[in-house]
Structure formats: C-alpha cells, structure tokens
Amino acid sequence: MKQATRKPTTPGDILLYEYLEPLDLKINELAELLHVHRNSVSALINNNRKLTTEMAFRLAKVFDTTVDFWLNLQAAVDLWEVENNMRTQEELGRIETVAEYLARREERAKKVA
C-alpha cells in the first residue's frame, strides 16, 4: 500500500465552493437547472452520494464543462478510498496473478503425472 495522502477534493466540494457559492446558486436552483430532485444535489454536495455518470453529464451541460472533468474528480476520490482502505488492501494482497495461478496449476499437474 502506498503512503497515505490527503483525500482528493470531492465533486460535491468542487460544486459547492467553485460553483454554487461564487454564483450565489442555491441547491434547489441547481436541482431545477439539472432537472433532478433537490435531494440528489444535496446528497452530492454533502458527500453522501457518489457522482454518477448521468449526473456528470448534467453538470457538464449546466456549467459548460466537460463530462471528464466531473468523472475524473470522482475517480480520484474512488481510487484514494481503495488505496487507503486497509481491509481492501489486505484482500487485494491475497489475489494472485494469472501467471502465478497457471504456474501453480502446472506444478500440480506435474505432481499428478
């Protein structure tokens, strides 16, 4: 596992601090622009929901950005969470490569033959 770094900024934080606050947009106003329920926007901003591809398309349209901008923010957070989750790293450490598996299978076959 690599050394822990600061968690990347979430799409919700970017949305709040780089878009809503500077533009003086309220959650319900953004929800109206996005054609989604207010709770969807609120959950994203409060980091209670991950950004979906569909929402990335909607945000890109509303703010004239790229879909990749939003998806890359979420991907960075997702990668950080996996890389810094000890339990997940332990599980990943038990996974063998296909080359290791094939070598082990070949060794077993030699012993049987």
From Swiss-Prot:
<keyword id="KW-0805">Transcription regulation</keyword>
<keyword id="KW-0238">DNA-binding</keyword>
<dbReference type="InterPro" id="IPR010982">
    <property type="entry name" value="Lambda_DNA-bd_dom_sf"/>
</dbReference>
<dbReference type="Pfam" id="PF01381">
    <property type="entry name" value="HTH_3"/>
</dbReference>
<feature type="DNA-binding region" description="H-T-H motif">
    <location>
        <begin position="27"/>
        <end position="46"/>
    </location>
</feature>
<feature type="domain" description="HTH cro/C1-type">
    <location>
        <begin position="16"/>
        <end position="70"/>
    </location>
</feature>
<protein>
    <recommendedName>
        <fullName>Uncharacterized HTH-type transcriptional regulator YbaQ</fullName>
    </recommendedName>
</protein>
<comment type="similarity">
    <text>Belongs to the VapA/VapI family.</text>
</comment>
<keyword id="KW-0804">Transcription</keyword>
<dbReference type="InterPro" id="IPR013430">
    <property type="entry name" value="Toxin_antidote_HigA"/>
</dbReference>
<dbReference type="GO" id="GO:0003677">
    <property type="term" value="F:DNA binding"/>
</dbReference>
<dbReference type="InterPro" id="IPR001387">
    <property type="entry name" value="Cro/C1-type_HTH"/>
</dbReference>
